[in-house]
Swiss-Prot record:
A GO molecular-function annotation: sulfate transmembrane transporter activity
Biological-process GO terms, alphabetical: chloride transmembrane transport; sulfate transmembrane transport
Lineage: Eukaryota, Metazoa, Chordata, Craniata, Vertebrata
Membrane topology note: Multi-pass membrane protein
Family to which this protein belongs: Belongs to the SLC26A/SulP transporter (TC 2.A.53) family.
A Pfam family per the record: Sulfate_transp
Protein name: Putative solute carrier family 26 member 10P
Length: 563
């Protein structure tokens, strides 16, 4: 397929014209760029389970690359909490923390080197996948990224980020939980170890949040009156570093600190390609999440400032950012909501704002690194949590979303799956119908993972309790297709009952309903399993989940599975 070379060559030209249209008096000041890039970069590196300095690398190289290739004028790239958390899960799974206790200096360096290698391999894999999507011109996928879907993703991930940072806030050394129900496993281990919390780190965390939260509220409430936002992160870092240095809390109370940040840049190194098969299952969702967040954020600002973005070019820009930066030991990156808003508020109008922020990160890498030696890691955890403020605030929109569109609201309810079958159900598609249904129900072979039809092995993230079969796209069904529905019901009856899954049928037209009636399916179900619209079925399913009826009755009534 022919690549769009014109879009590649137009990026330097757009940067050149930006010098004429961008006024220097609107350049973002260091007090904006320093707290929005350097400090969160080090904080998000802890989420990715790599040393803090690699967060600075990830705040530098991807910004340079995206500035040359991206089409989002107001977009700021770099470290992102959700991607860092997903990367950290892969790193912890492939290079777990040893159970032998304290490690020696050499052992710690070897462990960090292995973890950095895995994180860089994940970035390389996700970048390669996005470049492949650019070649296939899959930018049309951005049209399916509705606002409720993106908010559902970020809201759920924000809860994972919050719980993952609580051990650092409390001074607890707990292994990171991975796999299904990791959120609840982390919460259980946290509550169990709560009596062992460090009073010193707990005090540092409380004071840090007491400073950060009010400052961020003041910046939001008085953003029109303040000439510049209050740099709460900068003040906090300076105060915490000075306090830790003068009182020696790191040695007296065993408070964990950032330590030495190596100066300069890492040597370019190709990630271990042997790790790619092991991290493919992690690279694909990271690539999709990276594009989803970046494309939606770019579209918001493009609509606000009346210009257009090229979705395929965004695949190229973010793919190149991840792939090339992985050669410098960077972990996966994408556009960031907080940094983008800060740079826009500071007057940034083009990607030159991102290049300006690179100079601030460069100064930290070359000269200012030693000043962060005594910075407590608990402070970075507090910055992580406070940076997700906007994501937590968007949960307040759930009641409004419920009144506007209950189906969009239910996108954020775990345990519910709405499965739409958009083709006629006849002898040629009945096998595909059965495979798709079994895969979405998680009833394939194996306990922990299942194989998607014509696809790789993927993990089942959330257990499905209620499935709504949307038959609005089934225009007709022949005898073979209708009998397949009956056979699927008989074949899955026991497994649905054991897995406690309920199946509901919605929006079936009169022709298809008549065919299903003639083959005997509708004689085996009660009217409360049939719904006129998907919205009615979803509302009924939500009530069942809230009442716990799916746990009590399983699937004994769903499509006659219990008969």
């Amino acid at each position: 397929m022919r690549l769009d070379l014109a879009s590649l060559m137009s990026a330097p030209k757009s940067l050149g014209s930006a010098f004429k249209s961008w006024r220097l008096d609107k350049a973002p000041s260091p007090q904006h760029t320093f707290p929005s890039t350097s400090i969160p970069g080090m904080a998000f590196a802890l989420l990715a389970s790599v040393p803090p300095v690699f967060g600075l690398y990830t705040s530098f190289f991807p910004v340079l690359i995206y500035s040359l290739l991206g089409t989002g004028r107001h977009l700021s790239t770099g470290t992102f909490a959700i991607l860092s958390l997903m990367t950290g899960s892969a790193v912890e799974r492939l290079v777990p923390e040893p159970l032998v206790g304290n490690l020696s200096g050499i052992e710690k360096e070897q462990l960090d080197a292995q973890r950095v290698g895995v994180a860089a391999a994940v970035a390389f894999g996700s970048g390669a996948l996005m470049l492949g999507m650019f070649v296939l011109q899959l930018g049309v996928l951005s049209t399916f990224l509705s606002e409720p879907v993106v908010k559902a993703l970020t809201s759920g991930a924000a809860l994972h980020v919050l719980l993952s940072q609580l051990p650092s806030l409390l001074g607890l050394s707990l292994p990171r939980q991975i796999g299904c129900f990791s959120l609840f496993k982390t919460l259980a281990s946290l509550l169990t170890a709560l009596p062992r919390s460090s009073p010193a780190e707990l005090t540092i965390s409380a004071l840090s949040l007491a400073l950060l939260v009010p400052v961020k509220e003041l910046n939001v409430r008085f953003r029109d009156r303040l000439p510049t936002p209050i740099p709460g992160e900068v003040v906090l870092v300076l105060l915490a570093s000075v306090l830790c240095f003068t009182s020696s809390v790191d040695t007296r109370y065993q408070v964990q600190i950032v330590g030495l940040l190596p100066g300069g840049f890492p040597q370019p190194l190709l990630p271990n390609l042997a790790e790619l098969p092991r991290i493919l299952a992690d690279s694909l969702p990271i690539a999709l999440v990276s594009f989803a967040v970046s494309a939606s954020l770019a579209s918001i600002h493009a609509d606000k400032y009346s210009y257009t973005i090229d979705s395929n070019q965004e695949f190229l820009a973010h793919g190149a950012s991840n792939l090339i930066s992985s050669l410098f030991s960077c972990f996966p990156n994408s556009a960031t909501l907080a940094t983008t808003n800060l740079l826009v508020d500071a007057g940034g109008k083009t990607q030159l704002a991102g290049l300006f922020s690179c100079t601030v990160v460069l100064s930290v890498l070359l000269w200012l690194g030693p000043f962060f030696y005594y910075l407590p890691k608990a402070v970075l955890a507090c910055i992580n949590i406070s940076s997700m403020r906007q994501v937590f605030c968007q949960m307040q929109e759930l009641p409004q979303l419920w009144h506007i569109s209950r189906v969009d609201f239910l996108l954020q309810v775990p345990g519910l799956c709405i499965l739409s079958y958009p083709t006629p159900l006849y002898f040629g598609t009945r096998g595909q119908f059965r495979c798709n249904l079994e895969w979405h129900l998680g009833l394939g072979e194996g306990e922990k993972e299942t194989s998607k039809p014509d696809g790789p092995m993927v993990a089942v993230a959330e257990p499905v309790r209620v499935v709504v079969l949307d038959f609005s796209g089934v225009t007709f069904a022949d005898a073979a297709g209708a009998r397949e529905v009956v056979q699927v019901r008989e074949r899955l009856a026991s497994r649905c009952r054991d897995a406690r899954i309920r199946l509901l049928l919605a929006q079936c037209n009169a022709l298809v309903q008549g065919t299903l009636t003639r083959v005997g399916l509708l004689d085996r179900v009660t009217p409360d399993q049939l719904f006129v619209s998907v919205q009615d079925a979803a509302a009924y399913a939500l009530g069942s989940l809230l009442r716990g009826s799916s746990t009590r009755s399983g699937s004994q009534e769903a499509l006659g599975c219990g008969k």
